[in-house]
């Protein structure tokens, strides 16, 4: 009777700025490391943005005093890394030269804890799912000492948890800097809150689904990020995570997320967006085999 | 400061000038005015001396006092909706006259809108106030058929809300947290059930509601926007009454009656929701079978010790519970308790001492038996408030007193259980003391001119604990912490003093017209931290500290009041301008939930609000009601927000607040067809609220992120809001017939009668669903209506 209702509209928007966007979340991993430099698009444009070509992009390890020139590819500037270039504790600079101006950003690669394990739990039917089901968690301990920031990425059966509401971050063992939990197992919302999809990927199915069934796998990566990147992603979370429905009451005002990409000319009026960060990565995964499932059930009934 | 001093001196001069003339034989006639049917005190009833232009009104406890020269007088007691009463007095000594007025039989001719004298709006010094008695509130068609105090005041000029489901209300461009909501003088920190759909006040226990939008007397303070003063019934001191109702959302029951006839009485009123009806609001977020309910219990008792002493004890307990299972859920609620002691030191000096406790808390829990994450927040206050009314003479009524409030804030409790092991990581509690002393005089200077002038000295002390010191940064970024240290427990970390002058005048141009004006300065020492589209139950209260200055507001208002056809019609026009300082705003991505460094993410700015309120009311006849139109602006200027291209300094430009609603039209009409059937209707038209539309989208970190060219805030408006509600009441359906005692009625209401999908917000998001990495992503704009259909409701109410 009181259901809220929503419908899509096509309002006319102000003129877009179409500014340069630098998407540079690099890691210490081997293989291809990519920096995407594109232009922002009019808000309702849904095509993939094209790479801005003809730029000079350089990654500098300020601590080791080494620099790497990135190669222009079809949709990114990249490095094919065969020997490690990212080291915990090192400071890095990304330099982007356009014909008119030079932009740079600084990031520090911070430590990352290992993942002890990925585990599954057996649950009887509850208010979320009306049948017995398995849920997953990962176990990892934040090292002692405050100020560690992490971005936790995960994949179920190889599909990335990339929905806005699945952006999972930790500050020390908890969620944000103002919540002082340090040097212990990540809090439950971080361990389990974002990797148990109860909604089906099929839009036709509205009932809650068991997050994991026998045969599914989960792979988790913890990326260390620096404080500036943490603040950036935290603000980004509020901008992209629009629950809709009654949840809109809890949404915060729309505003621009920060950037650490700066012109080398302090008087520059050019706006750029995007972020540069260097992450150390730890990873672990496990498949919910029938053996794992039986063990979880046994543990539950103990 | 110069202005303050000037006003203080002026006040003193006026007082001295008007010293009572002791030379003559002066005697006082005083007493209480009550309802003869149930003993309830009559607030704001008039007492006039026949043949002379002398009179007074009863205070909130029904007390009056007039001092006159020796002689014979006829006193005329009046209260709208009651038979007038006259009493001859031969005044040769101080005389106590407690009077009981009889409710009028002629219901159809009665003014339904408010009590008071028929020309109260002309003669009273007060302006920028709005009063509703519970009888008129009960007549309005209500959302889901539930009579609601807060929803009713939203029909008054200058009062708005950002939409259905939003908690609280906005007054003259102020935010929700700038309203002080008092229930029998105890502040209620969160006035809503079920987010903002219903208010926490049980109409069966409410007697009188008064809203001060401006011209606030000196005895009130602590918030910069408004004071909503709700008074509870005392309980029938003559006979037992049981009243209640069965509605679509609540079922209600109230019992009142004498403990000892005319000496002591009580009222207990309770409500509880039928959860499943409303749970459907949450269809998107929650599954079926969600346990969800809310309830409140209101109780009051009073004891008439003797002629000079009366005590009252009242309490409120309410809670909203939304539980998924024993380890997951959300709940919140208020608790208040007030003790009051009315004492007459003499016929001329009335005093009231109030002591109260008020608490608000909420909590979330998430997890299972081994892994649980619980967070919450709480604010508690203990308050003592002595107040004196000194009825000096017929021309002066002095009010003075003080207030001391002790605050305890629990900004964030956090209990974390991981693999069976529990750690408590709650943030440190914070303590503060607020105090005030004030004096105010109502002075009748001439037949035409009356003044109310007062001064309030307020004080706030933020007490010991951990002190955080932050450095400067570009506005809009998190401020860096530069020092963190312990301060002794009861030591003063930061304190503030402020003088708050209050001044009102009423120039009576004729018996049917007056010109009124006021200046009000208010300070606010505690802040409601809310960075969401609408105020919600998880907003936390935060004291002023070494990092947050108290808010301040100066308001001037000027009004013209005119009555026509023997007070059948009341018209008024008021213009106001409000300057606000040290308004709280937030950096982008501020974490206002549980955050010990919250202050590093707060911004401070100034605000301004101005507008014009036009109001017309028809008081008598079968058709009564009012129309109002408010033209208003409300804007903020905060560095770090809406700063355009100024990347370096980020000096903010003025931007409209979320509750800036240019045009606001309200209509309330009541029609009494006959003794049995009456109709009512409300209509609201409100300009769309401002919101921010993006211009661009960025691809970064694997997400599509909105971007706003030129860093604008609130650059667009959502479509206008308008809604019609209709109501019908059929009296005495079962009771009152065939010799059955008591009365009852069936109230039928239709909310949103023409089923408009009023927009609550327009939001921008990427398409829903899982998009494979690297695929193009669509972005959409969605218009949301919280209530998108006609909502009919039926309720049965009874009293016997």
Q: What residues fall within each predicted segment?
A:
Chain B
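A beta-strand signature from Gram-negative outer-membrane beta-barrel systems
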Residues: 99, 155-156, 200-241, 252-254, ...
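Periplasmic N-terminal accessory/gating domains of Gram-negative outer-membrane beta-barrel systems
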Residues: 112-117, 121-179, 183-216, 233-234
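Surface-exposed extracellular loop regions of Gram-negative outer-membrane beta-barrel proteins
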Residues: 361, 408-419, 461-482, 511-555, ...
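Gram-negative outer-membrane beta-barrel transporters
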Residues: 576-579, 598-695
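C-terminal beta-signal and adjacent terminal beta-strands/loops
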Residues: 676, 684-704, 721-725, 729-800
């Amino acid at each position: 009777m009181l259901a809220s209702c929503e419908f899509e509209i096509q309002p006319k928007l102000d003129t877009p700025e179409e500014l340069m966007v630098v998407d540079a979340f690099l890691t210490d991993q081997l293989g291809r490391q990519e920096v995407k430099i594109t232009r922002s698009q009019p808000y309702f444009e849904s095509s993939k943005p094209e790479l801005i070509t003809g730029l000079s992009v350089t990654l500098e390890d300020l601590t080791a005093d080494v620099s790497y020139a990135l190669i222009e590819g079809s949709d990114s500037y990249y490095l094919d890394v065969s020997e490690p270039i990212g080291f915990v504790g090192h400071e890095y600079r990304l330099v982007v030269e356009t014909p008119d101006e030079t932009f740079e950003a600084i990031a520090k690669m911070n430590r990352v804890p290992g993942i002890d394990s990925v585990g599954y739990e057996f649950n009887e039917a509850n208010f979320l799912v009306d049948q017995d089901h398995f849920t997953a968690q990962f176990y990892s301990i934040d090292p002692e000492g405050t100020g560690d920031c992490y971005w936790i990425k995960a994949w179920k059966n190889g599909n990335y948890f990339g929905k806005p509401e699945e952006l999972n971050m930790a500050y020390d063992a908890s969620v944000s800097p103002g919540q002082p939990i340090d040097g212990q197992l990540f809090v439950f919302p971080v361990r389990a809150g974002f990797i148990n999809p109860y909604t089906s990927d099929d839009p036709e199915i509205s009932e809650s689904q068991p997050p994991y069934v026998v045969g599914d796998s989960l792979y988790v990566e913890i990326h260390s990020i620096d404080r500036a990147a943490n603040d950036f992603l935290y603000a980004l979370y509020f901008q992209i995570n629009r629950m809709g429905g009654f949840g809109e009451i809890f949404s915060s005002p729309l505003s621009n997320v920060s950037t650490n990409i700066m012109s080398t000319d302090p008087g520059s009026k050019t706006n750029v967006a995007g972020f540069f960060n260097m992450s150390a990565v730890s990873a672990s995964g496990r498949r919910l085999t029938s053996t794992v499932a039986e063990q979880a059930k046994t543990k539950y009934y103990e | 400061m110069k202005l303050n001093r000037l006003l203080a001196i002026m006040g003193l001069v006026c007082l001295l000038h008007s010293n009572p003339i002791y030379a003559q034989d002066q005697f006082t006639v005083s007493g209480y005015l009550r309802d003869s049917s149930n003993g309830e005190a009559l607030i704001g009833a008039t007492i006039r001396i026949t043949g002379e232009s002398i009179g007074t009104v009863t205070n909130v406890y029904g007390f009056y006092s007039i001092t006159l020269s020796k002689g014979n007088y006829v006193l005329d007691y009046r209260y709208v909706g009651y038979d007038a009463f006259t009493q001859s007095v031969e005044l040769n000594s101080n005389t106590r006259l407690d009077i009981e007025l009889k409710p009028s039989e002629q219901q159809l001719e009665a003014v339904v809108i408010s009590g008071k004298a028929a020309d109260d709006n002309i003669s009273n010094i007060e302006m920028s106030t709005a009063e509703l008695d519970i009888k008129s509130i009960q007549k309005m068609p209500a959302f889901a058929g539930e009579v609601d105090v807060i929803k009713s005041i939203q029909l008054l000029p200058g009062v708005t809300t950002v939409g259905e489901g939003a908690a609280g209300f906005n007054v003259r461009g102020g935010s929700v947290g700038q309203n002080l909501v008092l229930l029998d003088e105890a502040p209620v920190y969160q006035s809503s059930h079920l987010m903002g759909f219903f208010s926490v006040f049980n109409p069966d226990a409410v007697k009188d509601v008064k809203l001060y939008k401006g011209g606030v007397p000196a005895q009130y303070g602590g918030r910069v926007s408004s004071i909503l003063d709700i008074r509870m019934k005392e309980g029938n001191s003559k006979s037992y009454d049981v009243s209640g109702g069965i509605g679509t959302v609540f079922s209600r029951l109230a019992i009142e009656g004498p403990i000892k006839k005319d000496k002591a009485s009580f009222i207990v009123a309770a409500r509880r929701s039928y959860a499943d009806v409303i749970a459907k609001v949450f269809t998107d977020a929650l599954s079926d079978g969600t346990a969800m309910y809310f309830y409140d219990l209101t109780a009051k008792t009073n004891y008439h010790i003797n002629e000079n002493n009366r005590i009252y004890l009242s309490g409120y307990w309410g809670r909203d519970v939304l539980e998924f299972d024993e380890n997951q859920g959300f709940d919140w609620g208020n608790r208040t308790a007030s003790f009051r002691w009315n004492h007459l030191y003499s016929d001329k000096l009335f005093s009231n001492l109030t002591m109260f406790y008020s608490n608000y808390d909420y909590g979330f829990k998430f997890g299972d038996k081994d892994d649980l994450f619980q967070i919450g927040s709480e604010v508690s206050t203990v308050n003592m408030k002595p107040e004196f009314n000194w009825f000096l003479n017929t021309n002066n009524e002095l009010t003075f007193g003080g207030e001391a409030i002790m605050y305890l804030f629990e900004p964030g409790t956090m209990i974390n259980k991981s693999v069976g092991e529990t750690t408590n990581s709650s943030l440190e509690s914070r303590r503060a003391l607020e105090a005030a002393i004030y004096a105010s005089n109502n002075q009748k200077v001439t037949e035409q001119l009356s003044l109310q002038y007062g001064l309030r000295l307020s004080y706030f002390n933020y007490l010991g604990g951990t002190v955080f010191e932050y450095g400067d940064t570009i506005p809009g970024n998190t401020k860096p912490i530069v020092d963190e240290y312990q301060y002794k427990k009861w030591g003063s970390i930061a304190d503030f003093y402020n003088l708050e002058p209050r001044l009102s005048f009423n120039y009576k141009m004729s018996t049917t017209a007056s010109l009124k004006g006021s200046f009000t300065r208010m300070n606010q020492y505690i802040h409601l931290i809310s960075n969401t589209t609408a105020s919600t139950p998880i907003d936390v209260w935060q004291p002023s500290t070494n990092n947050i200055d108290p808010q301040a507001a100066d308001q001037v208002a000027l009004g013209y009041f005119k009555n026509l056809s023997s007070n059948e019609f009341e018209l008024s026009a008021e213009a106001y301008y409000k300057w606000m300082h040290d308004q709280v705003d937030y950096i982008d991505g501020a974490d206002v939930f549980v955050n010990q460094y919250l202050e590093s993410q707060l911004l401070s700015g100034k605000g301004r609000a101005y507008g014009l309120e036009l109001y017309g009311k028809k008081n008598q006849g079968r058709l009564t009601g009012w129309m109002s139109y408010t033209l208003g602006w409300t804007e903020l200027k905060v560095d770090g927000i809406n700063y355009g291209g100024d990347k370096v300094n980020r000096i903010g430009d003025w931007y409209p607040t979320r509750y800036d609603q240019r045009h606001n039209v309200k209509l309330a009409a009541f029609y009494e067809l006959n003794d049995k059937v009456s109709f009512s209707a409300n209509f609201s038209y409100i300009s769309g609220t401002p919101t921010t539309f993006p211009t661009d989208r960025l691809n970064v970190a694997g997400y599509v992120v909105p971007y706003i060219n030129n860093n604008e805030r609130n650059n667009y408006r959502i479509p206008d809001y308008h809604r019609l509600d209709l109501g019908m009441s059929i009296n005495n359906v079962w009771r009152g017939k065939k010799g059955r005692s008591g009365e009852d009625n069936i109230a039928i209401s239709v909310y949103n009668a023409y089923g408009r999908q009023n927009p609550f917000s327009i939001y921008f998001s990427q398409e829903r669903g899982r998009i494979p990495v690297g695929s193009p992503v669509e972005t959409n704009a969605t218009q949301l209506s919280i209530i998108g259909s006609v909502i009919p409701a039926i309720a049965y109410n009874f009293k016997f």
